[in-house]
């Protein structure tokens, strides 16, 4: 009769050992907040468009005048701006007010700028349509410039389609591009900055945002779509 209690004791001991063997170790404390799939699915209310959709929206329309900002819109030109800061005002933005910097930037330093793929597609599309293309930049004007030739070569613009770059400059409290867009009767204007979009909207042109590359020297990055404008997908490069 004593064998049954002993057998039961052995069973309980075995079960307790098994439970101990499979007991979960305490989880380590999380290092970061992490993310769940619902958070990943959240998107900002931005009107995304592709180059093909822009082209389709212009179908049936006669040739128009279109405009492009330069820096961070058609060219990744941070190498020149970075060089200018290092050479003329290390750690500061004062170089942007130095005529010597602009002389160099507008006369050769764009040899180190990279043409953006989105700009190649856009310009090719507008050339095919027969549109007039203008480049309107906030860079300071210099006595000479090679930017026009650089853009012509980078984007394969025929000689009879080339318009000299418009150097609108930068003036405090004033959007210097607005009057130029009006004077050239530009109907579509592409740009990466808020000023580009608001300049277009102020003259009833269609402002379309090109994404500024995250490694651009021009900080902070703007909030694309903040003015209800169209934003081109995959346009950061």
Swiss-Prot record:
The lineage, from the top, is: Bacteria, Pseudomonadati, Pseudomonadota, Gammaproteobacteria, Enterobacterales
Active-site residues are 69, 71
Tell me how the cofactor is bound.
Binds 1 Mg(2+) ion per subunit.
Q: What is this protein called?
A: Class B acid phosphatase
* Required cofactor names: Mg(2+)
Quote the SUPFAM superfamilies the UniProt record gives.
HAD-like (SSF56784)
Q: Which UniProt keywords apply?
A: Hydrolase, Magnesium, Metal-binding, Periplasm, Signal
Q: Which GO terms describe its cellular component?
A: outer membrane-bounded periplasmic space
| Disulfide linkage | none
Q: How does it assemble?
A: Homotetramer.
Instruction: Give start-end of the signal peptide.
Output: 1-23
Q: Does the keyword Nucleotidyltransferase apply?
A: no
Matches recorded under Pfam families? Acid_phosphat_B
